[in-house]
Amino acid sequence: MKKIKKAIIPAAGLGTRFLPATKAMPKEMLPILDKPTIQYIVEEASKAGIEDIIIVTGKHKRAIEDHFDNQKELEMVLENKGKADLLEKVQYSTDLANIFYVRQKEQKGLGHAIHTAKQFIGNEPFAVLLGDDIVESDTPAIKQLMDVYEETGHSVIGVQEVPESDTHRYGVIDPSAKEGSRYEVRQFVEKPKQGTAPSNLAIMGRYVLTPEIFDYLETQQEGAGNEIQLTDAIERMNSKQQVYAYDFEGNRYDVGEKLGFVKTTIEYALKDPEMSQDLKAFIKQLDI
């Protein structure tokens, strides 16, 4: 069985929920404290043992490439000024993994974005990490899925429970047999109408997929939102080869919408030893 060494991070979306901030800045570069959101995703992949990452980008996304590239002039300035701690942080972001880029020329959905990276992946199993979900866990969320793949040899989709009132916002599974946190799946449903979801186990932006998924993506018809949905292709593949769902451990932060982004920023700031006390004092004086 081939080890998983490659990952895809889709980052071609327009970020309309954050306009006008994202008119010229990629949504993925919006910072949680002092790091852009996409760096948290790359760090998770790197900690899981991923060596090669392809980021699927679009127009006006060059800042992502610049962030993970060397910037010798900046490094020289920091070194000359004796700012070793900042120098280490800057160099760290460039050494996380081998990072490559491909453009999604049309906005045709997540499934289309994944298919755009087919040549990079080749005939290997691979991971997918979506940038809207930051997960804090002792074992990286994607590594938990990779471990299930190594046990079973089958594709694995990361899920977590959500309130029933929110199921229409996600892809949702209809689980059958369960072993620990691993589920066999009868059906994958993309954004079910409110009140019709088969469970409250929602797909949460982490996948380990076998290369056969590309065969299904190539012939996948448009689905929800008139886009090529990855969930629909996974559902078709599941009818031919078992696809598992895994309820991974960890705290998930939704940074794909404004309220979740603000909540994440506050929670991370409250954990930061340099600012937590001052922030707590500030919040207290707001008298809310």
Curated annotation (Swiss-Prot):
Its EC number is 2.7.7.9. Pfam families: NTP_transferase. Disulfide bonds: none annotated. CDD domains: UGPase_prokaryotic. Catalyzes the formation of UDP-glucose from glucose-1-phosphate and UTP. This is an intermediate step in the biosynthesis of diglucosyl-diacylglycerol (Glc2-DAG), i.e. a glycolipid found in the membrane, which is also used as a membrane anchor for lipoteichoic acid (LTA). Belongs to the UDPGP type 2 family. This is UTP--glucose-1-phosphate uridylyltransferase. It comes from Staphylococcus epidermidis (strain ATCC 35984 / DSM 28319 / BCRC 17069 / CCUG 31568 / BM 3577 / RP62A). The gene is gtaB.
